[in-house]
């Protein structure tokens, strides 16, 4: 039995949810999100809660059960509170700035990188060494953060590069004479 899947998703005040077959749509103060649940699970709206249950006891249904519940929960949190991912830039001359619909990054290459900001995502650079990515879709916020980090991942000797806030970088010692 899935410990996560058996918990119903509570819908807070100010958020409306609609379930039509396998399609779930959630609307809140920050926007609207849609999700289509896999056929292995059934989704039901019970008052101010959304309950997810497996249609059978096979392995695929049990695997999709907890995942579907978590995705529905992330939809509800996204439209009510939103999601944020912070990145830190470390290195001499490494910096970021938002210019219009682009994030300009100087990451030690011979050229600056212009990263286009997609619709539905807000990117801010409160300091030249900090980038904040916010949005209502947890998957998209994490994906954009991963794409920016992949432009210059932190290296293990000096820690230069783009890393998630709070991420531990395994450090190595330089070669000895």
Swiss-Prot record:
Keywords: Ribonucleoprotein, Ribosomal protein, RNA-binding, rRNA-binding. Part of the 50S ribosomal subunit. This is Large ribosomal subunit protein uL6. One of its GO terms (biological process) is cytoplasmic translation. GO terms for cellular component: cytosolic large ribosomal subunit. This protein binds to the 23S rRNA, and is important in its secondary structure. It is located near the subunit interface in the base of the L7/L12 stalk, and near the tRNA binding site of the peptidyltransferase center. It comes from Beijerinckia indica subsp. indica (strain ATCC 9039 / DSM 1715 / NCIMB 8712). GO terms for molecular function: rRNA binding; structural constituent of ribosome. The lineage of its organism: Bacteria, Pseudomonadati, Pseudomonadota, Alphaproteobacteria, Hyphomicrobiales. Belongs to the universal ribosomal protein uL6 family. Pfam families: Ribosomal_L6 (PF00347). PROSITE patterns: RIBOSOMAL_L6_1.
């Amino acid at each position: 039995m899935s410990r996560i899947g058996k918990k119903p998703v509570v819908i807070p005040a100010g958020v409306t949810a609609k379930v039509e077959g396998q399609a779930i749509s959630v609307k809140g103060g920050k926007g609207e999100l849609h999700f289509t649940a896999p056929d292995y699970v059934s989704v039901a709206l019970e008052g101010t809660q959304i309950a997810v249950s497996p249609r059978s006891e096979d392995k695929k249904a049990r695997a999709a059960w907890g995942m579907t519940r978590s995705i529905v929960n992330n939809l509800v949190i996204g439209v009510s509170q939103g999601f944020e991912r912070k990145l830190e830039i470390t290195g001499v001359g490494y910096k970021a700035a938002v210019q219009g619909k682009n994030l300009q990054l100087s990451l030690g290459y011979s050229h600056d990188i212009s990263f286009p900001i997609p619709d539905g995502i807000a990117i801010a650079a409160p300091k030249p060494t900090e980038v904040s990515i916010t949005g209502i879709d947890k998957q998209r916020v994490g994906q954009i953060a991963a794409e920016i980090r992949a432009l210059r991942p932190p290296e293990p000797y000096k820690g230069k590069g783009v890393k998630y806030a709070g991420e531990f970088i395994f450090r190595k010692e330089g070669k000895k004479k």
